[in-house]
Each structure stands twice: as structure tokens, then as C-alpha cells.
Amino acid sequence: MSEEKDRVDGTADETKAETKSSDHHTEDTYEKVCFMCRRPESKAGKMITLPGNINICPDCMQKSFDTMNQNPGQINEMMNNMNNMPNIGMFDLSGLSNQIPNRQRVKKKEEKKKTKEFSIKDIPPPHRIKAMLDEYVIGQERAKKVMSVAVYNHYKRVFAPQDGNIEIEKSNMLMIGPTGSGKTYLVQTLARLLDVPLAITDATSLTEAGYIGDDIESVVSKLLAAADNDVERAEHGIIFIDEIDKIAKKKNTNQRDVSGEAVQQGMLKLLEGSDIEVPVGANSKNAMVPLETVNTRNILFICGGAFPDLTDIIKERLNKTASIGFQADLKDKYDGDKNLLSQVTLEDLRTFGMVSEFLGRLPIVFTLESLNEDMLVEILKEPKNAILKQYKRLLELDEVKLEFDDDALRSIARKALEKDTGARALRSIIEDFMLDIMYEIPKDSSIGEVIITKDYIEKTGGPTILLRGQEVPKLEQK
């Protein structure tokens, strides 16, 4: 009898242990989900558990408190009139447990493997950085060289042993180039090749703290999110602020410039290096969201813009240096110079409306060339992830070969130049012409090859479509 009792007790203990182990495994495998917004704990932050095992995220809890605090009179009035409203009852939390959907927890995403410790020996030299950029970016030779050296020096500064006597300044950059010349693409490619987190923001959305719009510190919050909330990784990342020319100082205005000069002034400490408190898993600071401190001292800032009126300022400066008798000739010469931006000076940028202190924190200034027809044709064909290679691969999956005539590529490049939006026009043009082809091909398994011709691009004919094993055109677009 005693042995049997011991056996039963042992079985019970084992069951308890298994249950405990199972619960522990569940906790490790699953995460809580907010009852109101349905975001998991990894996205919304640590959950607040209410009676009945109801999980609420900090954001939703804060919004509930804010709503109650805004209209206390209305809530009191409703409470006083409860007896006169027989069909309405108070919200009972205890009854919620029966209404909660089963899916209150979701599986945790597998944790990413920790990246290798980065050291000064791992920093690729400038010629290797440029060689990697060459595989993806066509042209812009000087811009790629300047960026390669600046990035190399920046990360040397970050990972080199500290020398108390010499402090190396940050290599923040200002790139100036026409729309569609590849500013954003260059930065994206650079960050991907170096495997560092990247945050891209638009300067037009930034305003001085306290005004409607994104405050200046929000750019650091985006970088922290890009680094999966890993502060150390974020502190070695890159922030790209596009359309920086849009925050130039406004001229002849008596109103406070909250989205121009004030934003430039507000960014000074950020560019130089300071401790910034940013919310984790939320877009704005509030009492219920945990904050992380991010130091921007080792974050590389790259600003870019088209600066559309800057060429007029450069022309005016160059003409002032010429004698009166030659001014007309020089003006005509500069009017035809598509790469006039390459002669920009800091004085020109100050005249444009950029604050001197702001420019002082962007020591490396360089320009990008305007894209010509030859460069656009190269962009279509040559990079590792060229647009044509992507479409060829898509048709390969349908076992169809895709080719483009050289004249067709020239015609596409000319159409892109007419749109005056640079390389970004190429994809939309090709997508437009490929739509019908990609729609029709899966219908007919006998099609073996499609050749895009100049006539098709210029809408005077159709593509050449060949049957499998045949050399004779099958269909022409009407």
C-alpha cells in the first residue's frame, strides 16, 4: 500500500514538473498581445496585465488615461445619470475574460544571431568600398570616391583607440545633386554593404519641438527601430536626411521659421554628438513607454538635397568675378553647363539659406552629376540588380527568354530624360511596357522568347514574340 502511494505521489510530482516545464517553454516561445491594438509585446513594449489576464500595451493604456483626463465633466455626468439609463451598464473587466479571443499570445520571432564584434581591422579600405559601390551604382565616380574615404575615416575614428591629445572630428556629409541622380540609392547601398543600420527621413516633415510634425529627435528613434532596438548597434549606424534644401532659412518673413532655420539650429547638437532619449517601440514619448538613451557621437549623418536655385547663385558669383565686357559670354557659357553645381562653395550655400553653424557640422560637401542618356542605358543593364536583369529573371520563371534591342534601351533612356526625374523614371517606363507582356505570357506555353524593340517603345509597332524552337515572329501588337 505504501509503495503504491509513493508511486502515485511520484507520478504527481512528475506531472507537476512537466506542467511547470511546459509553462516555462510556453513563456519562452510565445509573447503577449495587446487586447486593444493587437500588437505583440516585441512591437508595443512590455504589457500591463489587468484582472482576467487581459493584456494592454503602454500606448493604449496611456490613450485611455488621456481620454479620461480630457473630459472629466462628461464622465462625472455619465456616472450620475447611470440610474436613468437602464440599458447601459458599467464596463465590467471581470466579464471580459469570456470575450477574449483565444489568440492572446503569438509565437516569438526567432532571435537573430548576434552580429560579429566590429573592429578597426574589419573596416574595408576606400578602394574596396568604392569597388563594392561600382557593382551597384553607375557613374558618379567622384561622389563614390568621396563617400568611400569619408566612411572609412569615420569608422576608423569610431573604433580606433582613444588618444587624449587628438580628437578626430566626425565626417558628416552633405551631398548635392539633381532629382533622381542617385543620392538615396548611394546611401542605401553603402549601408547594406557595410551591414550597418540605416534610417532615412525627409527634412520636410521635421519641425521645431512643440509644433505639429516630427520633432528632430525622431530621426534617432527611427535608427533605433532599424537596429532592432539595439542601442549599441544604432550608435554605429547611418542617418540620411533627404531634401535638406527644404529647411533653408526663409527670406523676407516676419513669422517664426519653425520648419526652416529653427530645424537647422535644433540639429546642431544631434550632428555634433549628444545623448538623446528616445522611446522604445513607440513613436512618441509618454509616461508609459520606456526610454533608451542613444549617443549620436558615432552616428554618421549624411544630408542630401537637389538645391534647385543654387545654380543661379553660383552663376551670379562667377559672373561677378568676370570683367564687364565678358559677362554676357560667360553667362551663356554657364547656362549650358549641366554640372555647374560642382563649383559650389560654402558661401553659395549660405546665400541659399543654410546656417553657417549647420554647414560647419557637415565638413564634407560633394556633388552628383546629372544623368545623361549613356548613363541611363548603363543603369538599365550593368548593375548587379539592374532593372533589366530583374525582369529577365521574372520571365525566366515562366521559362521565357526576354531580350531588349539596343535601340529600345536608347528610346527608354530618352523618355526618362523627358520626365526629368532621373533614374527613378526608368522602372515606371519599363513597367508600363511590360504590363501587357507579363499578363499574356502565362496564357500561352508555346511562347519561348520576347524581344522588346524600339518600335514597341515608341508605340509604332509591337514586340517580337517567338515560339519555342522557332525564329519566326508569332505576334505583333496592333
What are these regions (language model features)?
Residues 1-240, 245-478:
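Non-catalytic accessory segments flanking P-loop/AAA+ NTPase cores
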